[in-house]
A protein has these predicted regions:
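Append "Primarily bacterial transcriptional regulators
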Residues: 44, 189-196, 201, 205, ...
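…primarily DNA-binding HTH/wHTH and HhH modules…
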Residues: 252-271
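Amphipathic alpha-helical segments enriched in hydrophobic/aromatic residues interleaved with Lys/Arg
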Residues: 92-138, 143, 147
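Terminal helix-turn-helix DNA-binding modules in bacterial transcription factors
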Residues: 207-249, 268-271
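Single conserved hydrophobic/aromatic residue that forms the stacking wall/gate
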Residues: 1-4, 8-9
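A short, Lys/Arg-enriched amphipathic alpha-helix from helix-turn-helix/homeodomain DNA-binding modules
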Residues: 134, 156-194, 216-234
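N-terminal regulatory/effector-sensing and dimerization cores
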Residues: 9-95, 126
Length: 271
Protein backbone atom coordinates (compact mmCIF):
# COMPACT_ATOMS: atom_id res chain seq x y z
CA UNK A 1 0.00 0.00 0.00
CA UNK A 2 1.27 3.48 -0.86
CA UNK A 3 0.01 6.91 0.11
CA UNK A 4 1.67 9.87 -1.58
CA UNK A 5 1.00 13.44 -0.52
CA UNK A 6 1.83 16.64 -2.32
CA UNK A 7 1.91 14.73 -5.61
CA UNK A 8 2.51 17.05 -8.55
CA UNK A 9 0.92 16.08 -11.88
CA UNK A 10 2.87 17.65 -14.72
CA UNK A 11 3.38 14.72 -17.05
CA UNK A 12 1.15 14.31 -20.09
CA UNK A 13 2.31 10.76 -20.73
CA UNK A 14 -0.08 7.90 -20.19
CA UNK A 15 0.42 6.38 -16.74
CA UNK A 16 -0.41 2.77 -15.93
CA UNK A 17 -0.60 1.36 -12.42
CA UNK A 18 -0.62 -2.29 -11.37
CA UNK A 19 -2.69 -1.46 -8.31
CA UNK A 20 -6.05 -0.15 -7.27
CA UNK A 21 -5.30 3.55 -7.52
CA UNK A 22 -7.03 6.72 -6.34
CA UNK A 23 -5.71 10.07 -7.52
CA UNK A 24 -6.77 13.25 -5.74
CA UNK A 25 -6.16 16.36 -7.83
CA UNK A 26 -6.59 19.69 -6.10
CA UNK A 27 -8.53 22.01 -8.37
CA UNK A 28 -9.52 25.61 -8.89
CA UNK A 29 -12.90 27.16 -9.70
CA UNK A 30 -11.80 27.95 -13.26
CA UNK A 31 -10.76 24.37 -14.00
CA UNK A 32 -13.34 22.23 -15.80
CA UNK A 33 -11.38 18.98 -15.88
CA UNK A 34 -12.38 15.32 -15.68
CA UNK A 35 -16.06 15.95 -16.35
CA UNK A 36 -16.52 18.78 -13.86
CA UNK A 37 -19.47 21.03 -14.69
CA UNK A 38 -20.34 24.50 -13.49
CA UNK A 39 -22.74 23.03 -10.89
CA UNK A 40 -20.05 20.74 -9.38
CA UNK A 41 -17.73 21.51 -6.48
CA UNK A 42 -14.21 22.59 -7.47
CA UNK A 43 -11.94 22.06 -4.45
CA UNK A 44 -10.58 18.70 -5.61
CA UNK A 45 -11.33 15.79 -7.93
CA UNK A 46 -10.95 12.06 -7.27
CA UNK A 47 -10.18 9.60 -10.07
CA UNK A 48 -10.33 5.83 -9.50
CA UNK A 49 -8.39 3.19 -11.45
CA UNK A 50 -8.44 -0.60 -11.39
CA UNK A 51 -5.15 -2.57 -11.58
CA UNK A 52 -3.67 -2.27 -15.07
CA UNK A 53 -5.88 0.64 -16.12
CA UNK A 54 -4.23 3.58 -17.90
CA UNK A 55 -4.61 7.24 -17.02
CA UNK A 56 -3.67 10.30 -19.02
CA UNK A 57 -3.74 13.87 -17.77
CA UNK A 58 -6.33 16.11 -19.41
CA UNK A 59 -4.94 17.07 -22.81
CA UNK A 60 -6.59 20.50 -22.71
CA UNK A 61 -4.57 21.77 -19.77
CA UNK A 62 -1.12 21.23 -18.31
CA UNK A 63 -1.76 20.12 -14.76
CA UNK A 64 0.42 21.70 -12.12
CA UNK A 65 -1.94 21.15 -9.22
CA UNK A 66 -0.74 19.25 -6.22
CA UNK A 67 -2.60 16.23 -4.96
CA UNK A 68 -2.49 12.82 -3.33
CA UNK A 69 -2.19 9.27 -4.55
CA UNK A 70 -3.40 6.10 -2.85
CA UNK A 71 -2.35 2.78 -4.38
CA UNK A 72 -2.89 -0.71 -2.98
CA UNK A 73 -2.19 -4.13 -4.47
CA UNK A 74 -5.06 -6.63 -4.81
CA UNK A 75 -3.08 -9.04 -2.60
CA UNK A 76 -3.62 -6.65 0.32
CA UNK A 77 -7.32 -7.55 0.21
CA UNK A 78 -6.89 -11.29 0.82
CA UNK A 79 -8.74 -12.50 3.93
CA UNK A 80 -10.08 -9.03 4.77
CA UNK A 81 -13.63 -7.66 4.66
CA UNK A 82 -12.51 -5.43 1.79
CA UNK A 83 -11.87 -8.50 -0.36
CA UNK A 84 -15.62 -9.22 -0.40
CA UNK A 85 -16.68 -5.58 -0.55
CA UNK A 86 -14.35 -4.15 -3.21
CA UNK A 87 -16.86 -5.08 -5.93
CA UNK A 88 -19.38 -2.71 -4.33
CA UNK A 89 -17.18 0.29 -5.11
CA UNK A 90 -18.21 0.46 -8.75
CA UNK A 91 -16.64 3.90 -9.24
CA UNK A 92 -13.32 2.12 -9.83
CA UNK A 93 -14.81 1.27 -13.25
CA UNK A 94 -15.91 4.82 -14.09
CA UNK A 95 -14.21 6.87 -16.78
CA UNK A 96 -11.84 9.66 -15.65
CA UNK A 97 -14.47 12.04 -17.10
CA UNK A 98 -16.85 10.70 -14.44
CA UNK A 99 -14.60 11.77 -11.57
CA UNK A 100 -15.84 12.74 -8.12
CA UNK A 101 -15.64 16.49 -7.44
CA UNK A 102 -15.27 17.47 -3.79
CA UNK A 103 -16.34 20.36 -1.62
CA UNK A 104 -13.82 21.82 0.82
CA UNK A 105 -15.37 19.90 3.72
CA UNK A 106 -15.34 16.64 1.74
CA UNK A 107 -11.75 17.19 0.64
CA UNK A 108 -10.70 17.74 4.26
CA UNK A 109 -12.33 14.45 5.33
CA UNK A 110 -10.76 12.55 2.41
CA UNK A 111 -7.28 13.88 3.22
CA UNK A 112 -7.84 12.98 6.88
CA UNK A 113 -8.56 9.38 5.79
CA UNK A 114 -5.42 9.34 3.64
CA UNK A 115 -3.35 10.66 6.54
CA UNK A 116 -4.67 7.87 8.77
CA UNK A 117 -3.58 5.29 6.20
CA UNK A 118 -0.19 6.96 5.85
CA UNK A 119 0.28 7.07 9.61
CA UNK A 120 -0.45 3.34 9.91
CA UNK A 121 2.07 2.62 7.14
CA UNK A 122 4.73 4.29 9.29
CA UNK A 123 3.92 1.99 12.21
CA UNK A 124 6.05 -1.09 12.75
CA UNK A 125 4.46 -4.05 10.94
CA UNK A 126 2.69 -6.52 13.21
CA UNK A 127 -0.20 -8.99 13.00
CA UNK A 128 -2.73 -6.13 13.04
CA UNK A 129 -1.24 -4.01 10.26
CA UNK A 130 -3.06 -5.56 7.30
CA UNK A 131 -6.44 -5.49 9.06
CA UNK A 132 -6.10 -1.87 10.17
CA UNK A 133 -4.90 -0.61 6.78
CA UNK A 134 -7.64 -2.46 4.89
CA UNK A 135 -10.27 -1.05 7.25
CA UNK A 136 -8.93 2.47 6.81
CA UNK A 137 -9.10 2.00 3.03
CA UNK A 138 -12.64 0.65 3.32
CA UNK A 139 -13.65 3.67 5.41
CA UNK A 140 -12.06 5.95 2.82
CA UNK A 141 -14.03 4.24 0.03
CA UNK A 142 -17.25 4.46 2.06
CA UNK A 143 -16.79 8.22 2.25
CA UNK A 144 -16.23 8.27 -1.52
CA UNK A 145 -19.50 6.36 -1.97
CA UNK A 146 -21.31 8.92 0.18
CA UNK A 147 -19.85 11.81 -1.78
CA UNK A 148 -20.68 10.23 -5.15
CA UNK A 149 -24.29 9.92 -3.98
CA UNK A 150 -24.20 13.60 -3.03
CA UNK A 151 -22.86 14.38 -6.52
CA UNK A 152 -25.77 12.48 -8.08
CA UNK A 153 -28.10 14.76 -6.08
CA UNK A 154 -26.19 17.86 -7.21
CA UNK A 155 -26.56 16.67 -10.80
CA UNK A 156 -30.27 15.89 -10.49
CA UNK A 157 -31.41 17.94 -13.49
CA UNK A 158 -28.68 16.72 -15.92
CA UNK A 159 -29.33 13.16 -14.72
CA UNK A 160 -33.02 13.50 -15.57
CA UNK A 161 -31.97 14.37 -19.12
CA UNK A 162 -29.92 11.16 -19.23
CA UNK A 163 -32.98 9.17 -18.11
CA UNK A 164 -35.04 10.88 -20.83
CA UNK A 165 -32.40 9.93 -23.40
CA UNK A 166 -32.51 6.37 -22.07
CA UNK A 167 -36.26 6.30 -22.69
CA UNK A 168 -35.68 7.51 -26.25
CA UNK A 169 -33.11 4.73 -26.69
CA UNK A 170 -35.76 2.26 -25.54
CA UNK A 171 -38.29 3.56 -28.06
CA UNK A 172 -35.74 3.28 -30.86
CA UNK A 173 -34.78 -0.22 -29.69
CA UNK A 174 -38.40 -1.37 -29.87
CA UNK A 175 -39.20 0.36 -33.16
CA UNK A 176 -36.12 -1.07 -34.86
CA UNK A 177 -37.20 -4.62 -33.99
CA UNK A 178 -34.19 -5.32 -31.76
CA UNK A 179 -36.44 -6.45 -28.92
CA UNK A 180 -38.09 -9.17 -31.00
CA UNK A 181 -35.33 -11.62 -30.02
CA UNK A 182 -36.33 -11.16 -26.37
CA UNK A 183 -33.08 -9.49 -25.30
CA UNK A 184 -33.47 -6.26 -23.34
CA UNK A 185 -31.00 -3.39 -23.86
CA UNK A 186 -27.84 -3.90 -21.81
CA UNK A 187 -25.97 -1.38 -19.68
CA UNK A 188 -23.16 -1.54 -22.25
CA UNK A 189 -25.56 -0.73 -25.10
CA UNK A 190 -27.06 2.26 -23.30
CA UNK A 191 -23.74 3.55 -21.98
CA UNK A 192 -22.16 3.38 -25.42
CA UNK A 193 -24.97 5.45 -26.92
CA UNK A 194 -24.92 7.92 -24.03
CA UNK A 195 -21.09 8.13 -23.97
CA UNK A 196 -20.89 6.95 -20.37
CA UNK A 197 -19.21 4.01 -18.69
CA UNK A 198 -21.56 1.05 -18.06
CA UNK A 199 -21.02 1.17 -14.30
CA UNK A 200 -21.64 4.92 -14.06
CA UNK A 201 -24.81 4.57 -16.13
CA UNK A 202 -26.05 1.66 -14.00
CA UNK A 203 -25.37 3.53 -10.75
CA UNK A 204 -27.02 6.70 -12.08
CA UNK A 205 -30.11 4.75 -13.20
CA UNK A 206 -30.36 3.00 -9.83
CA UNK A 207 -30.01 6.28 -7.94
CA UNK A 208 -32.57 8.14 -10.05
CA UNK A 209 -35.20 5.40 -10.45
CA UNK A 210 -34.53 2.92 -7.65
CA UNK A 211 -34.31 0.14 -10.25
CA UNK A 212 -31.48 -1.79 -11.84
CA UNK A 213 -31.34 -1.88 -15.62
CA UNK A 214 -33.26 -5.16 -15.92
CA UNK A 215 -36.06 -3.96 -13.65
CA UNK A 216 -36.22 -0.60 -15.41
CA UNK A 217 -36.57 -2.04 -18.90
CA UNK A 218 -39.03 -4.69 -17.77
CA UNK A 219 -41.20 -1.83 -16.52
CA UNK A 220 -40.74 0.02 -19.82
CA UNK A 221 -41.65 -3.17 -21.66
CA UNK A 222 -44.91 -3.44 -19.74
CA UNK A 223 -45.73 0.27 -20.24
CA UNK A 224 -45.07 -0.12 -23.96
CA UNK A 225 -47.34 -3.16 -24.16
CA UNK A 226 -50.21 -1.15 -22.65
CA UNK A 227 -49.61 1.70 -25.07
CA UNK A 228 -49.52 -0.67 -28.05
CA UNK A 229 -52.69 -2.46 -26.95
CA UNK A 230 -54.44 0.90 -26.87
CA UNK A 231 -54.08 0.97 -30.66
CA UNK A 232 -56.96 -1.08 -32.08
CA UNK A 233 -54.79 -2.07 -35.06
CA UNK A 234 -52.41 -4.02 -32.81
CA UNK A 235 -53.40 -7.57 -31.93
CA UNK A 236 -52.23 -9.28 -28.75
CA UNK A 237 -50.07 -11.61 -30.83
CA UNK A 238 -48.42 -8.70 -32.64
CA UNK A 239 -47.65 -6.91 -29.36
CA UNK A 240 -46.21 -10.08 -27.83
CA UNK A 241 -44.02 -10.63 -30.89
CA UNK A 242 -42.87 -7.00 -31.15
CA UNK A 243 -41.87 -6.92 -27.48
CA UNK A 244 -39.94 -10.17 -27.62
CA UNK A 245 -42.12 -12.44 -25.49
CA UNK A 246 -41.54 -16.13 -26.19
CA UNK A 247 -45.19 -16.72 -27.05
CA UNK A 248 -48.56 -15.01 -26.81
CA UNK A 249 -49.75 -17.31 -24.01
CA UNK A 250 -46.85 -16.29 -21.76
CA UNK A 251 -47.42 -12.61 -22.53
CA UNK A 252 -51.17 -12.91 -21.82
CA UNK A 253 -50.56 -14.72 -18.54
CA UNK A 254 -47.99 -12.16 -17.38
CA UNK A 255 -50.13 -9.20 -18.45
CA UNK A 256 -53.16 -10.52 -16.57
CA UNK A 257 -51.05 -11.24 -13.49
CA UNK A 258 -49.88 -7.62 -13.40
CA UNK A 259 -53.08 -5.80 -14.40
CA UNK A 260 -55.81 -8.21 -13.40
CA UNK A 261 -57.23 -8.32 -16.93
CA UNK A 262 -56.27 -10.23 -20.08
CA UNK A 263 -54.63 -8.27 -22.94
CA UNK A 264 -57.70 -8.62 -25.17
CA UNK A 265 -59.95 -7.30 -22.41
CA UNK A 266 -57.60 -4.36 -21.85
CA UNK A 267 -57.49 -3.71 -25.59
CA UNK A 268 -61.29 -3.63 -25.82
CA UNK A 269 -61.58 -1.36 -22.78
CA UNK A 270 -59.23 1.16 -24.40
CA UNK A 271 -61.10 1.15 -27.69
Amino acid sequence: CLVGSEMCIRDRRTLKFGFYTVILIEGHAEDFLYGRKYYDYSNASLIFLTPGESFKADKNKILSQKGWLLAFHPDLLYHTSLEANIKNYSFFYYKPEEALHLSLREKTKIIECLCNIGEELQHAIDCHTKTIISRYIELFLDYCTRYYERQFITRNEPNKLIINKTDLLWDEYVQSGKLMNGILPSAEYCARNLQLSPHYFSDLLKFETGKNIYEYFQQKRFETSKRMLSDKNNTTALVADKLGFSNVQYFSSLFKKITGVAPNEYRISQN
